[in-house]
């Protein structure tokens, strides 16, 4: 749909979270036109991610309601605000929950992808000018992670958009907006896995499976996939896992099982769940002297991690990774190209597709462990 004459607001179908722990409601909201430095996009597809469910549960310390969730999408630019030069109407884009302005201290450092240009307001569910572009029956609706892909139309900061190849399949590349990029990037950018290294992946959701795929790309020697749901093992092996372990099959902690495989531990471990107890096991199963454990999963508000200091004194390293260390505007377009060439597999992640009206079913499938990613289409 093209908007030939831009009015001050347009109508948009959206799945709105009016309160925590309640089903999303499909309603027609008002979306204002983009202001300076902003872009109006029409989302064509969006994945449903565990992070959306985490916020909906009420456990997210930055969760605000009512809100349009969704942060793993792909769409087309409809209109641009004053000063926007990097995209134009008709361009195909992926919204970014991790912006890249290129000008803040973090971007200029070259050491991180954690741009802070819009971070403060984004964490409050607002646009950079501290207002919202969404409303319903005259009441403001908050944005989410700077993306809000559960609305057909959304307004996003220019610095939070990656321009991509218009030939890309949106049903698949939308997953590069979060889960797949997070997992693959953590392997290459955060852990820097080398050929022949051993890898253990705790949790085989989309992110964990993406870690497995990234480890295979890095030519890791042994890739151990760990999950309590053995139904995920077939796909893990398809992505490159050499071993699949179910902790419920053992009468001892999975950490000890891994130390039986190698008494000194695993070169790189990845926690992809958000469970602080698993985070400890992942660290303590890392190789003595040089092993590193990468925390990707997001734990609930107020939860803390712990271990004996001796685990770190003896050479293990604990690291965190956000969006796989990937710089969205400058690096994500190449990942889209890689997926189009088959170097990144995306299709196997999409286990279900459905229209927006059925989005609550997508959350049910996720909670029941019956899906890897459900993609919503508009």
Curated annotation (Swiss-Prot):
Major localization class: cytoplasm
Needed co-factor(s): Zn(2+)
An example molecular function term from Gene Ontology annotations: zinc ion binding
E.C. no: 1.1.1.284, 1.1.1.1, 1.1.1.-
Catalytic function, reaction form: S-(hydroxymethyl)glutathione + NADP(+) = S-formylglutathione + NADPH + H(+); S-(hydroxymethyl)glutathione + NAD(+) = S-formylglutathione + NADH + H(+); a primary alcohol + NAD(+) = an aldehyde + NADH + H(+); a secondary alcohol + NAD(+) = a ketone + NADH + H(+)
One Pfam family named in its UniProt record: ADH_zinc_N
SMART domains on file: PKS_ER
Domain of life, per lineage: Bacteria
Keyword Transmembrane helix in record: no
Binding site for Zn(2+) 2: 101, 104, 107, 115
GO cellular component annotations of the record: cytosol
CDD domains hit by this protein: alcohol_DH_class_III (cd08300)
Family of the protein in this entry: Belongs to the zinc-containing alcohol dehydrogenase family. Class-III subfamily.
Subunit structure: Homodimer.
Cited PANTHER family: ALCOHOL DEHYDROGENASE (PTHR43880), ALCOHOL DEHYDROGENASE CLASS-3 (PTHR43880:SF12)
Role of this protein: Has high formaldehyde dehydrogenase activity in the presence of glutathione and catalyzes the oxidation of normal alcohols in a reaction that is not GSH-dependent. In addition, hemithiolacetals other than those formed from GSH, including omega-thiol fatty acids, also are substrates. Also acts as a S-nitroso-glutathione reductase by catalyzing the NADH-dependent reduction of S-nitrosoglutathione.
Identification of the protein by name: S-(hydroxymethyl)glutathione dehydrogenase
Species this protein is from: Haemophilus influenzae (strain ATCC 51907 / DSM 11121 / KW20 / Rd)
């Amino acid at each position: 749909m093209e908007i030939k004459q831009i009015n001050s607001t347009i109508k948009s179908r959206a799945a709105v979270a009016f309160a925590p722990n309640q089903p999303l409601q499909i309603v027609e909201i008002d979306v204002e036109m983009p202001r300076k430095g902003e872009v109006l996009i029409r989302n064509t597809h969006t994945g449903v991610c565990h992070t959306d469910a985490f916020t909906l549960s009420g456990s997210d310390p930055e969760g605000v309601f009512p809100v349009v969730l969704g942060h793993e999408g792909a769409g087309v630019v409809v209109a641009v605000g004053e000063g926007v030069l990097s995209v134009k109407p008709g361009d195909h884009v992926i919204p970014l929950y991790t912006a890249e302005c290129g000008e803040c201290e973090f971007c200029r450092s070259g050491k991180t992808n954690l741009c802070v240009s819009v971070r403060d307001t984004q964490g409050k569910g607002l646009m950079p000018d501290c207002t919202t572009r969404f409303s319903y029956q005259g009441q403001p609706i908050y944005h989410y992670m700077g993306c809000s892909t559960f609305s057909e139309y959304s307004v996003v900061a220019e610095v939070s958009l990656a321009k991509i190849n218009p030939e890309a399949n949106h049903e698949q590349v939308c997953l590069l907006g979060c889960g797949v990029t997070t997992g693959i990037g953590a392997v290459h950018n955060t852990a820097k896995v080398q050929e022949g290294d051993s890898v253990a992946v705790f949790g085989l959701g989309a992110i964990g499976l993406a870690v497995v795929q990234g480890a295979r790309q890095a030519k890791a020697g042994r890739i151990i996939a760990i999950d309590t749901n053995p139904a995920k093992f077939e796909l893990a092996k398809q992505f490159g896992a050499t071993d699949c372990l179910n902790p419920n099959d053992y009468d001892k902690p999975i950490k000890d099982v891994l130390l039986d495989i190698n008494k000194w531990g695993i070169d790189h471990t990845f926690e992809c769940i958000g469970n602080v107890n698993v985070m400890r096991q992942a660290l303590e199963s890392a190789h003595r002297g040089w092993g590193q454990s990468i925390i990707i999963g997001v734990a609930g508000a107020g939860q803390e991690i712990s271990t004996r200091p001796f685990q770190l004194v003896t050479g293990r390293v604990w690291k965190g990774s956000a969006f796989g260390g990937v710089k969205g505007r400058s690096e994500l377009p190449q990942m889209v190209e890689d997926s189009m060439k088959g170097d990144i597999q995306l299709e196997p992640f999409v286990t279900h597709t459905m229209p927006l009206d059925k989005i609550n079913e997508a959350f049910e499938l996720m909670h029941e462990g019956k899906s890897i990613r459900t993609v919503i289409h508009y």
